[in-house]
Amino acid sequence: MERVSVNGVELEFSCAGSGEAVVFIHGGGIADTGLPLVVEPALRDHYRMIRYRRRGYGGCTRIQGPVSIAEHAQDCRALLKALEVAEAHVVCHSYSGLVAMQLAVDTPEVVASLALFEPTPLVVMDPEPLSESLQPIMGPIMEKYQAGDGVAAVDGLFSALFGPHWRAEVSRTVPGGPEQADKDAATLFDSDLLPGQDWHFGAEEAAKITQPVLFLTGSESLPLFGEIRGLLHAYLPQMEDDVMPGANHLLHLRHPA
């Protein structure tokens, strides 16, 4: 991957293809989830496909404490500016749904459209009750991480989201992805998974998003993501839905085409 300096940090990125720009923002934990889309001929042959690793992941500048959603959005904007991209279709997965929506709120002229691949519940849910409802799942996982076993914590989280064979499934389309996730555990648990991060999305913010929006969910995903879709419709009436048959939260990692 290439490197670029933006906002005082170095990010890794890659580009493929030509045409209208599409930027993929990865979710929490697995930095290269955009790879299956970037190499997909149906996309690469018609679009300029851009993917990057957020700060704290892979070979990017390591983080010193939590990174805010706004900072991640600023990083994406700065990357696009460095690549001389005035406008891009923004595709996001899981946690990065917050980043993409913040980007659309802060700099709407940069975002041509939004594709939300099962964004995190924090998009539309109050972090405190949400944290309480997820405690039975996240409690044991965080205990493992705080005990110093980052690999077990990563495995516990993604087994809950992706299923027990997630490492084999991810490796099929993102070679080395699970191993990199183990190395990036500190960024996942010390920044991305901190409840709320003082981030808010409501009617005032939603009114600034007038671009086309697509919400993609999997037919085998947790019911929680269906609830998120319903709640987002109240804020974004222009949003369209699509369901990927046979997919869970892995979505495009399980079915790239």
Predicted regions and their residues:
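Conserved alpha/beta-hydrolase catalytic His-Asp/Glu region
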Residues: G148-L188
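Conserved serine/cysteine hydrolase catalytic core
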Residues: P178-A234, E240-V243
